[in-house]
Regions:
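Bacterial Sec-dependent N-terminal signal peptides
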Residues: 1-25
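Buried hydrophobic residues that stabilize the cores of well-folded domains
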Residues: 21-276
């Protein structure tokens, strides 16, 4: 009998996006990691255990996931293991002011290192990544540099993307009337991402368009509670019209449960968080 793939790993595989979304991945995600560590520190959290459950309520077989935080809250280590995937360790390093400096995602198959630098206004100046993957026959190394410049309103104006230290592309940003980043354009291939916000400037939608199609394709849709926490995220399956809906529950500012549903509202599984 074939072993069932834990739902969490299945979802991560089918929603893993190859799309750019540099503003989202470099700047917004950076702020979220910093905010998460701040919340852990305020609640004196030292260990977080994640439990994964299948659609029938049974615990995902062979799944283990735990995050440990250092005493000074400058280091977080997330260890994940499952029967169907190699064990992985995701490490985040912060400076004394809580700014994210380094992330490292490592397993037997690949290692991804990302280094963040900031200017004197605490804005991201660069994001430098190195990905090393191992196969039976060869080792593949990919590097990227994202170098940001800003306008007089402290908004990202341009990003120079350098791949493997030789191939460069300029990414341009545009803004809406509320000075939110609303457009991200790759000047080489014409790909555009549109960012939409609610009245509180929370990001609500990321929509993709390109020069060869007039049809706008949503990648993510977010909903929030009164405290500004994400209560629902809709993520489109890569290369498909299917999508998954994540619903989040919080207590004292910390996420305690999330469940995943298909576009047909069928429960795929859930995750529960334990804090110590």
């Amino acid at each position: 009998m074939l072993r069932k793939i834990p739902f969490l790993f299945y979802i991560l595989l089918v929603t893993a996006s190859a799309n750019a979304q540099y503003y989202f991945k470099d700047i917004i995600s950076n702020k979220q990691l910093i905010a998460d560590m701040t919340a852990y520190k305020e609640n004196k959290v030292r260990t977080i255990t994640l439990k994964s459950f299948e659609d029938n309520g049974s615990e995902s077989e062979g799944f283990f996931c735990e995050k440990k935080l250092s005493r000074d809250y400058r280091k977080a280590e997330l260890f994940t293991r499952a029967d169907i995937a190699p064990a992985s360790l995701f490490t985040s390093i912060f400076d004394k002011d809580g700014m994210l400096l380094i992330t490292k995602d490592s397993s037997d198959l690949s290692v991804t290192d990302i280094v963040y630098t900031y200017d004197d206004k605490r804005r991201i100046a660069s994001v430098i990544s190195h990905i090393k993957s191992n196969d039976d026959d060869f080792v593949n190394i990919i590097s990227q540099e994202h170098i940001y410049t800003y306008n007089e309103n402290n908004q990202p104006e341009k990003m120079i993307l350098v791949k493997n230290k030789k191939d460069s592309t300029i990414i341009l940003f545009g803004y809406d009337d509320n000075r939110n980043v609303s457009i991200e354009k790759d000047t080489k291939n014409g790909t555009k991402f549109f960012y939409y916000y609610d009245s509180k400037k929370n990001l609500t939608d990321i929509v993709q368009a390109n020069e060869y199609s007039k049809r706008l394709k949503p990648d993510y849709v977010f909903e929030y509670n009164s405290a500004g926490k994400i209560t629902q995220m809709t993520a489109v399956e890569e290369g498909s019209n299917n999508y998954f809906i994540w619903k989040y529950t919080y207590d004292n500012g910390l996420r305690i449960k999330e469940k995943c549903l298909t576009n047909e509202k069928r429960l795929m599984g859930s995750i529960e968080y334990e804090y110590k």
